[in-house]
């Protein structure tokens, strides 16, 4: 397993490096056969108004799957402890899902409820968008089923996940609904 530790607004000392290495290796030790690479990003916010100044983010690459967790606190070592525990839980869930898949599949209709979408989602409000693009990301988007995209959404610890639907070969977005459950956004031809 390859471990990369980086710091933003912080010098990664030997003591910090050793602590991160110990915690991350302990978190992923039962999943060595799945894990190929682990990226750790440590950062300190210089803004006095931010309460959780020390942030630790761990990204694990496991058999083509990305598993991500981040935690913040007032203490860097506490953030490292929290994120190590969180990534260990996520890896355990990932391994259990792999084992469950070997014993039977779940249908898409059981995961995502099919509901009609309102035509005007924002009503009379004006969309609040940033005036300029701050950052662009590029990543491979292999075709996958909605079930696999849902699994990825849960593993990356975001509110949404964009993917290429293997059934339609179109870009879809699966997201966490505010009132619970998940939703899928699919392109629709304008008539």
UniProtKB/Swiss-Prot annotation:
Superkingdom classification of source: Bacteria
One GO process term, biological-process aspect: negative regulation of translational elongation
Compartments in which it is found: Cytoplasm
The gene coding this protein: hpf
Protein name: Ribosome hibernation promotion factor
Main location: cytoplasm
The keyword Ubl conjugation is annotated on this UniProt entry: no
Keywords: Cytoplasm, Translation regulation
SUPFAM superfamilies, A to Z: Ribosome binding protein Y (YfiA homologue)
Family: Belongs to the HPF/YfiA ribosome-associated protein family. Long HPF subfamily.
Gene Ontology MF terms: ribosomal small subunit binding
Annotated GO CC locations: cytosolic small ribosomal subunit
Alphabetized Pfam families for the sequence: Ribosom_S30AE_C, Ribosomal_S30AE
Keyword Cytoplasm: yes
Stated role: Required for dimerization of active 70S ribosomes into 100S ribosomes in stationary phase; 100S ribosomes are translationally inactive and sometimes present during exponential growth.
Subunit structure comment from the entry: Interacts with 100S ribosomes.
Annotated source species: Synechocystis sp. (strain ATCC 27184 / PCC 6803 / Kazusa)
């Amino acid at each position: 397993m390859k471990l990369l530790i980086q710091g933003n607004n912080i010098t990664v000392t030997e003591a910090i490096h050793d602590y991160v290495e110990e915690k991350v290796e302990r978190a992923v030790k039962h999943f060595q056969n799945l894990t190929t690479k682990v990226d750790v990003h440590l950062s300190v916010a210089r803004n006095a108004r931010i309460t959780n100044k020390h942030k630790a983010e761990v990204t694990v690459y496991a058999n083509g799957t990305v598993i991500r967790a981040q935690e913040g606190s007032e203490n860097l070592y506490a953030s490292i402890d929290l994120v190590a525990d969180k990534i260990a839980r996520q890896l355990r869930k990932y391994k259990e899902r792999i084992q469950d898949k070997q014993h039977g599949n779940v249908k898409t209709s059981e995961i995502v409820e099919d509901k009609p979408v309102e035509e005007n989602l924002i009503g009379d409000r004006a969309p609040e968008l940033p005036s300029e693009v701050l950052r662009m990301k590029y990543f491979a988007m292999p075709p996958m089923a909605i079930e696999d995209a849902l699994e990825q959404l849960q593993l990356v610890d975001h509110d949404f996940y964009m993917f290429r639907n293997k059934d339609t070969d179109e870009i879809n977005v699966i997201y966490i609904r505010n009132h619970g459950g998940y939703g899928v956004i699919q392109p629709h031809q304008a008539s």
